[in-house]
Amino acid sequence: NGKYCTFPHAIEFLNRKYADIFPILTSYPELENYLSPFMDAWESSAVEQLQGQIASAKIPLSRMISPALYWVMTADDFTLDINNPEEPKVLVVGNNPDRQGIYGAALGLYNSRIVKLINKKKRLKSAVIIDELPTIYMRGLDNLIATARSNKVAVMLGFQDFSQLKRDYGDKESAVICNTVGNVFAGQVVAETAKTLSERFGKVLQKRQNMTINRNETSVSINTQMDSLIPASKISTLTQGMFVGAVADNFDERIEQKIFHAEIVVDNEQVKRETARYVKIPQIIDFTDKDGNDTMQQQIDANYYRIKNEVRQIVADEIERIKADPELSHLIKDK
């Protein structure tokens, strides 16, 4: 029933010995072909080759071994199909700047799963809003932007600069993300980002007037040439509150003025009034025992050790199953 099919269980299993992992996985016909190269290397005692291949996966995952993270990523408090008409949800997750590399991987896992679940027909209107996009990796984001509009999913991304996105997502994927979005709002940016935005906004035919004055006469010439609608120099010197951007329209909702350079006025008094009406997030789980003691850490630690013990027991049961099966017993190497 999926009770043990959690990410923490997978991490614990991956950190078992090769003598446990390979026979167990190979014993399942649907996994046998995937494990074949590893089994060949293991049976031929090519341990160094195996260690190099598997360490690249084990080391990043091992950094995620944490009682707190194990607590969050086990059990089934809710499903991730946030736009399910039967059970709609608002899901908010945040990264920790001090442990960005660790939690970013966990958030990326959740995000990738959410993308697959929400991008379907016959679902509620929904939105995926990501601030500081480069701090987490979201697999399939480019495809979500390209296809989600037809499934009533709005995608809103916030980041400081295109160079950040290139650094963390790579040149190709970041280029696809930037070129696929239909609406762009930008404040002050410099260098390559300002130049890219200026090119995106296009050029317009502008008149230029030149006046030449000498002792005998004054001459005026008027000519036209294509110039940037919003020059990069202007984008790089925008003041606070000033934005440039471009918006997309629909067949039945035409927008004549798609490019803008204007001030977005924020009603600070209204914001304060709204902030004053905020309510506290309700307490979902109470860790206080009957004597009034806070047992949060004890319960989190107990969950951590429970997962480790469950994986040990699963491995032991699977090894016994393989030994008892004449067709599989050859997978267990004699020590």
Residue ranges and their predicted role:
Residues 143, 166-313:
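P-loop NTPase motor core of the ASCE superfamily
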Residues 154-160:
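Structural recognition of the conserved hydrophobic beta-strand(s) that form the central parallel beta-sheet
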Residues 91, 156, 183-185:
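Hydrophobic/aromatic beta-strand patches that form the interior of the parallel beta-sheet core
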Residues 134, 162-163:
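Acidic, glycine-rich active-site loops and adjacent beta-strand->loop/helix elements
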Residues 1-153, 168, 236-239, 247-254, ...:
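P-loop NTPase motor domains
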